[in-house]
């Protein structure tokens, strides 16, 4: 399995602080039971970073109000 790096994620979200916020928010969603958007058997934090690197999760999710 390929390793995920910060550089891979920074291509999608160039600001490191926004990257941390987006990945943390998405990891919490995954722990609460949301389905992952990429195929992975890793922990929620790694899955969240893989989603960011793949471009399916971005910083726009930080401005959305949860229902």
From Swiss-Prot:
It catalyses: RNA(n) + a ribonucleoside 5'-triphosphate = RNA(n+1) + diphosphate. One of its GO terms (biological process) is DNA-templated transcription. The keyword Transmembrane helix does not apply. Its EC number is 2.7.7.6. Keywords: DNA-directed RNA polymerase, Nucleotidyltransferase, Transcription, Transferase. One of its GO terms (cellular component) is DNA-directed RNA polymerase complex. It is an enzyme of class 2 (transferase). The keyword Iron does not apply. GO terms for molecular function: DNA binding; DNA-directed RNA polymerase activity. NCBIfam families: rpoZ. Promotes RNA polymerase assembly. Latches the N- and C-terminal regions of the beta' subunit thereby facilitating its interaction with the beta and alpha subunits. The RNAP catalytic core consists of 2 alpha, 1 beta, 1 beta' and 1 omega subunit. When a sigma factor is associated with the core the holoenzyme is formed, which can initiate transcription. Belongs to the RNA polymerase subunit omega family. This is DNA-directed RNA polymerase subunit omega. The gene is rpoZ.
């Amino acid at each position: 399995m390929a390793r995920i790096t910060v550089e891979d994620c920074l291509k999608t979200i160039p600001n490191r602080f926004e990257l941390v916020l987006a990945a943390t928010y998405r990891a919490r969603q995954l722990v609460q039971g949301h389905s992952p958007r990429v195929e992975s058997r890793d922990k929620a934090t790694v899955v969240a970073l893989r989603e960011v690197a793949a471009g399916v999760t971005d910083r726009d999710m930080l401005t959305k109000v949860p229902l």
